[in-house]
Curated annotation (Swiss-Prot):
Belongs to the orthopoxvirus OPG163 family. This is Protein OPG163. Residues 1-14 form the signal peptide. It is found in: Host endosome.
């Protein structure tokens, strides 16, 4: 598996074979070029973290998940540990409650939502709307379009104020 960005409820990570082996990640969906995944975790008490766990752990902060030896970790202003999770062979330490996505190093005010949030949209970025690989920016979308997108998608990325990124999952009957 080549490196790619995977959006998870815990944040965004650059996935490589190593991370995929360390974390129990399952791919759930795609939104255009973005992969939507889930990390199977079990919350643990922070006091149960051992020194040996710290040698191979990950940190979640401001919408990004990085390994403990990442250069990106130096940019994190970590003041506290909010929670800790065990996943497969490692620990993930959450250092804030921010679920804002950090996609491709552009800290953006976007969050992962169920596709029902498409009904709050005034602007839609739609991938794969009419044909595979297409992209459309739609201002003031119709309710009919929103309904069709809702039925074709499971997730969307939203700023919470009306800007939605969604995948139309084009097929022969879409928008007919």
């Amino acid at each position: 598996m080549d490196a790619a960005f995977v959006i998870t409820p815990m944040g965004v990570l650059t996935i490589t074979d190593t991370l995929y082996d360390d974390l129990d990640i399952s791919i759930m969906d795609f939104i255009g070029p973005y992969i939507i995944g889930n990390i199977k975790t079990v919350q643990i008490d922070v006091r149960d973290i051992k020194y040996s766990d710290m040698q191979k752990c990950y940190f979640s902060y401001k919408g990004k998940i990085v390994p403990q030896d990442s250069n990106d970790l130096a940019r994190f202003n970590i003041y506290s540990i909010c929670a800790a999770y065990r996943s497969k062979n490692t620990i993930i330490i959450a250092c804030d409650y921010d679920i804002m996505l950090d996609i491709e190093d552009k800290h953006q005010p976007f969050y992962l939502f169920p596709s029902i949030d498409v009904f709050n949209a005034t602007i839609i970025e739609a991938y794969n709307l009419y044909t595979a690989g297409d992209y459309h920016l739609i201002i003031n979308p119709s309710d009919n379009l929103k309904m069709k997108l809702l039925f074709n998608s499971s997730f969307c990325i939203s700023d919470g104020n009306g800007w939605i990124i969604i995948d139309g999952k084009c097929n022969s009957n879409f928008l007919s």
